[in-house]
């Protein structure tokens, strides 16, 4: 909701946001601030569809973090600028084949042993370490950046006061807001 509110406002629309629970209390907080490009979907065997659709998300979000995207979130805190993914020897050959596929080529790099974080060096862990372009932002910081300029456009509403009108195919055709002053 907040992202869309910012986009609409940036494009000149007079928009407001009704929230029935807590701002960011759904997907924003559930994501833990993880911005990924679909590798988790690709690892499960889905190299098309969802994985392809979100492959560019890290690049898109990085542009927004620089203030160059469709929403300026340059004041949002970045917690980690990349992911590391480890695979043990049993999983390694299958993973190497997978990582060499066209859909992931150039997006993932093998980390040299001398560049391993202390944990991996100290424990002499067998396997391979990969650097992914995915990263982590501070979700509460993002909520603050997105909501701050729109405080006068944010409204908390009870779920019992809102009703969606639908056509015969269940498409939303209208919204009814009920209040003590009447129905809008």
Description of each model-found segment:
Residues 9-30:
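Glycine-rich FAD pyrophosphate-binding loop
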Residues 119-124:
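Glycine-rich phosphate/pyrophosphate-binding loop
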Residues 129-184:
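Helical element adjacent to the flavin cofactor pocket in flavoenzyme catalytic cores
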Residues 33-118:
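Dinucleotide-binding Rossmann-like beta1-alpha1 core, especially the glycine-rich loop
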Residues 18, 85-86, 132:
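Short hydrophobic segments within beta-strands
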Residues 30-34, 142:
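Catalytic-loop motifs flanking and including active-site residues across diverse enzymes
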Residues 2:
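Residues forming the Rossmann-fold NAD(P)(H) cofactor-binding site
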């Amino acid at each position: 909701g907040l992202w869309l509110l910012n986009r609409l406002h940036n494009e000149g629309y007079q928009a407001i946001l009704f929230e029935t629970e807590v701002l960011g209390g759904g997907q924003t907080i559930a994501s833990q601030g993880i911005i990924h490009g679909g590798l988790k979907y690709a690892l499960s065997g889905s190299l098309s569809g969802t994985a392809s659709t979100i492959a560019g998300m890290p690049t898109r979000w990085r542009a927004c973090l620089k203030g160059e995207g469709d929403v300026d979130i340059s004041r949002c805190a970045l917690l980690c600028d990349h992911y590391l993914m480890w695979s043990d020897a049993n999983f390694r050959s299958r993973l190497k084949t997978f990582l060499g596929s066209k859909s992931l080529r150039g997006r993932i790099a093998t980390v040299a042993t001398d560049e391993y974080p202390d944990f991996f060096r100290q424990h002499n862990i067998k396997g391979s370490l990969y650097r992914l372009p995915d990263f982590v932002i501070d979700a509460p910081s993002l909520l603050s950046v997105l909501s701050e300029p729109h405080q006068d456009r944010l409204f908390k509403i009870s779920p019992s006061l809102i009703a969606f009108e639908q056509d015969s195919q269940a498409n939303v055709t209208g919204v009814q807001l009920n209040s003590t002053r009447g129905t809008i």
